Structure formats: C-alpha cells, structure tokens
Curated annotation (Swiss-Prot):
Assembly description: Tetramer of two alpha and two beta chains.
The family this protein is said to belong to: Belongs to the TrpB family.
Species of the source: Clostridium botulinum (strain Eklund 17B / Type B)
Reported function: The beta subunit is responsible for the synthesis of L-tryptophan from indole and L-serine.
UniProt gene name: trpB
Official protein name in the record: Tryptophan synthase beta chain
SUPFAM superfamilies, per the entry: Tryptophan synthase beta subunit-like PLP-dependent enzymes
Claim: Amino-acid biosynthesis is one of the keywords in the record: yes
Signal peptide start-end: none
C-alpha cells in the first residue's frame, strides 16, 4: 500500500475501507444519510466552507493547540522523550469540538434546525452543545444514566449551553445504549435535524467526515514536532474508543517511517464484560449502521463492555481503524484501569497537566514504551483534560499517593 495516495482511495464511494464501513440502514434512514453524504461532498470542496472553518478554529477554538515536551516525566522514566499534542487546550477541553464545529457548519449549510447526538464521557455532548450555541441551533444529547452519574460536571455544562439531555435508562445505561436512543430520535426527526456522531464510526459518511475534521490534530502535530526537534517522532500513539482522536492524529503520519499505535481499554481484565478492547478480542460484525470489528456475546449481539473511561466503553471501533490494522500499518495495544490511573496521577504530578481518563490510557502506553525504548521519542495525542473525572477518581483512588511510594 502506497500511503501517499491512501486518502484519495479510502473510503470508496460506498464508504468502505476494504471490507469495513458502509451504511447499513433502515429504509427510512437511507435518504437521510444520503442527503448528509451529498451535502458533505459538496461543502468539503467549497472555499467558503473551508475558510469559515479555519476562522472558527483560530478565533473560537484557539487552534493550533501546542505540542509540549514532558521533560520531567521523561526524565523520571529514562532517556526516551515523551511529547504531548495538547488537545486538552482546545476550547471545551478536548478534541471533540474539531468535528462538532464542522458538523454544526454542515447542518447550517443544509438548513437543519437541530443537532442530535449521543455522548459517553460527556465531552462530545459539551462540544456539540457548544457548536449548537455558536450556530444558533437546537441540541439534543442522549446519555446513559451511569455516565450521567459519573460525569455530572459535563451534564451541567451541556444544560447551561442550552442542550436538552435525554437520560437513557435501558440495558447497561452507557454509551452503546445512548447511541441506540439517539438513532431512534433521529429516525423520527431527520427532516429538520442532523445526527452528529461522536466518533469516527457509524454509517457513511460519518467515519470520513469525522476523520477529515479531526485530521487538523495530526497535521498540526507533525509540523510542530518537526519544528521543535528537526525530525519525526519514533512512535505516535492515541487512545481508541470509537477512534476519532486517533484517526485525526494518525492519518498525517501514515506515509512516514513512524510506528503508529492505538490504545484500547483493558478495563478490569480479559473476561468478556470487563473490558472494551474490540480490536484485541472482537470479530467482524455490524452494529449502529457500519461494519467493523466488534465484541459479541454468545448470541452474536454486541457484548456488554466496561472501561473506567466513559468515552472508551464502546463494543466496536471505527471501520478505518479495523482496515489500518488489517493493512499492517497501525498496531493496537491495551492498557488496564490501574495503568491508566497511574499515568493520570504521574502526568498530573510531574507536568502539572491533569489528563482525561481516556487520554491517560495513551499516556500509560507511552510511559511503558519509553521504559522499553531507552531512547528516541514518543508523540501522544492528549485528547482531553481531566476536570470531568476528578470527583470520580478522588472517590475511588484518593489523591494518588499510592503511585509515589
């Protein structure tokens, strides 16, 4: 595979990345998603749209976000140098706003009045509520009751921004059920609404759109890292739930001689129901309108999943990630809850940066890899900040003293 031409080839016109992707939809939703795909194909080449998005990123989001050298953390581990792409400094505190502003601008272009979405950790919900406020649109966010309890600050932020938060009370009451609920609402309201999926997954064109809107992360990081150091990193890594921050971070490095590693949540362990490591333990399947690798129960349905990170507990992964692994270009590893928590506290104490639990999985891998590498450099996408997580963490882990004995 020549990755210099990869973006021109994938996805194909049917939204497929090899055997993955596509759009598996009910008859009533096919025209709705075709309308979105057609609108995106028109607007993504428009200089007016591109210029407006650039203006929003600069003036509203505060982009570009910096690349930061973790000198103290690196020194504590050894000679390998760890760098962070600081998406925690993007407006609203995570990478999610990158695609939400793009989706909001698309909705405006299409004449839609409402944005509908699911959220797990609440970051996508906050980002979409922010976009809705910016563009003067209504916003409806579906969120599992378990996540509402865990992520109270983000629920408050969404409501302050004017969003209607719909609690999801069936099943495990987490991210998968929130997606189900949001899909149901969109099916009833698609004529005046747009469904803004929160990751690089779902039916075509969402894996393509979210990747395109998030690629700004990787393009910035690549240029910034080269400017800082004079060379490319040896390893690029990001956490993977659905895979939006990872898709954005990885795409610009595909054609470069760089190891690319996605990090999934191993949670409490290898038993089904104790993790959300789709790539490690999953198999091919269809859910939520797209084909990818998914965790299945004995009946072939989406399996129950768990992660300490609400934004990672999803039983599948974006189709492009499945394809990139199949091509052998990107590798996927796992980090458990305990490793993520150690990274959370160590980054906080050594660098004064409190990361999201999701991002802590990628930081944990970078710390393990740095110890193994002895020298070289690792660039981590720090996908978000940890404000939303601190109450939950302090209640269950205290202030992290156990990691500094």
């Amino acid at each position: 595979m020549d990755f210099r031409t990869y973006l021109k080839k994938y996805p194909d016109k049917n939204g497929r990345f090899g055997q993955y992707g596509g759009a598996y939809l009910t008859a009533e939703l096919i025209p709705a998603f075709e309308e979105i795909a057609d609108a995106y194909q028109t607007i993504c080449h428009s200089s007016q749209f591109i210029n407006e998005l650039r203006r929003i990123r600069k003036e509203f989001q505060g982009r570009p976000t910096p690349v930061y050298h973790c000198e103290r953390l690196s020194r504590a581990i050894g000679n390998c140098q760890i760098y962070l792409k600081r998406e925690d400094l993007n407006h609203t505190g995570a990478h999610k706003l990158n695609h939400c502003m793009g989706e909001g601008l698309l909705a405006k272009f299409m004449g839609k009045k409402r944005l509908i979405a699911e959220t797990g950790a609440g970051q996508h919900g906050v980002a979409l509520a922010t976009a809705a406020a910016f563009f003067g649109l209504e916003c409806e966010i579906h969120m599992g009751e378990v996540d509402i309890a865990k992520q109270a600050p983000n629920v408050t932020r969404m409501k302050i921004l004017g969003a209607k938060v719909v609690p999801v009370t069936h099943g495990l009451k987490t991210l998968k059920e929130a997606v189900d609920s949001a899909f149901d609402s969109y099916a009833k309201n698609y004529k005046d609404s747009i469904y803004c999926i929160g990751s690089a997954l779902g039916p075509h064109p969402f894996p393509l759109m979210v990747r395109d809107f998030q690629a700004v992360v990787g393009y910035e990081a690549k240029d910034q890292f080269k400017e800082m150091t004079g060379f490319l990193p040896d390893v690029v890594t990001a956490c993977v739930g659905g895979g939006s921050n990872a898709a954005g971070m990885f795409i610009p490095f595909l054609e470069e001689p760089v190891d690319i590693i996605g990090i999934e949540p191993l949670g409490r362990g290898e038993k089904l129901g104790d993790h959300a490591a789709s790539m490690k333990y999953g198999e091919k399947g269809v859910m939520h309108g797209f084909e990818s690798i998914m965790l299945k129960d004995k009946n072939g349905d989406p399996a129950p999943v768990y992660s300490i990170a609400s934004g990672l507990d999803y039983p599948s992964v974006g189709p492009e990630h499945a394809f990139l692994r199949e091509l052998g270009r990107v590798d996927y590893k796992v980090i458990n809850d305990e490793e993520a928590m150690e990274a959370f506290f160590k980054l906080s104490r050594y660098e004064g940066i409190i990361p999201a639990i999701e991002s802590s999985h990628a930081v944990a891998y970078a710390m393990k890899k740095a110890e193994e590498m002895k020298q070289g450099s690792i660039l981590v996408c720090l996908s978000g900040r940890g404000d939303k997580d601190i109450d939950y963490i302090v209640e269950h882990y205290g202030y992290g003293e156990q990691y500094f004995k």
